[in-house]
Amino acid sequence: TCLHNKRRNDFDAYGESWLESVVRTKDNLNYNSVYIPYQFPPSYNAYRGGVPTKETEECLKYVLALAKICTPEDMYIDYAYFYPFELDEADIDEVNNRAANAERMLSEGGDVDQMLALAVERLKSDDEFAALREKYGDEFADRVLDSILKIPTLFTNVNFMGDWVDNYTADFCPYLSVFGSGRVTEHYASEAEKKNSEVWAYTCVGPVYPYPTFHIDDYNLGTRISGWMEKCYGIDGYLYWASTNGHNSLEWYKYVNQYEDSTRYVGADGDGYLVYPGKYYGSDTPLPSLRLV
């Protein structure tokens, strides 16, 4: 895809077309992640009254389907991750009790961990997976089951939240600017090592200059050195929100002319999109922004 070729892994497929998209892009040299396209609602519970909720059953469809197309050569489940953006920036945004929901869902043994444990139990008694075990062996099958339990859940924060880092099983994804302190960087790294997890970073409306951004009004130097900074700080992944947004945040119901209106979020022109519609100029593929150079 256009974004893969620019070293960006996007997610744009849902439902039945999702697995097809995963398989189709696996041979791209820049392929490195598989977004599981289930969005946890703010009130998500793995169980209710001792019975898996309908939300859990819906999420399991994706997890189990991905696990059952794995082979020793193509371990798709190793690339999988969740991104529950209903929990975004829970440290500053109390919409829908985000902080409380994050604690319930992401604490060790919380609702996400319970859902993944159920996925493993379902696979163990699944006939298709039993056939994979017979074909590829116990070592392969056990690796798939272990990988399911380790599927990361990205959790974005604006600030360093030490208690959360210590007690949640999420893969933390704070603002890139948080890593300016050696103490903070070491804390993230230490906890990630203990939990066999990763540390990500992200940028969106913030942080702003002098931190590197993908904003149109920033120097292009920023887009180039952000990767260097991530390497320096030992950051494993980078999240950008978002790459194909066609709405102004003040009018979500209304598309904008993307060649005339640079604003998706006030005060951060360029945030929310990294490509332009190619059809406008007769192209069947999106046209990448110079910010992707």
Give the location of each predicted region.
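Generic beta-sheet signal
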Residues: T156, Y175, Y202-C204, Y240-W241
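Flexible loop residues that form catalytic
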Residues: Q39, S177, S243
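A short acidic, amphipathic alpha-helical/loop segment
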Residues: W164, R183-A192
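Short, glycine/acidic-rich beta->alpha junctions
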Residues: S177-V184, D217-T223
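Aromatic- and carboxylate-lined catalytic core of secreted/periplasmic carbohydrate-active enzymes
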Residues: Y211, S226-V293
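Aromatic-lined carbohydrate-binding surfaces of glycoside hydrolases
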Residues: T1-T169, P207, H247
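Glycine-enriched alpha-helix->loop->beta-strand junction motifs that scaffold or abut catalytic
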Residues: D166-F172, K194-W200, G234-G237
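Active-site clefts of carbohydrate-active enzymes
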Residues: K195-T223
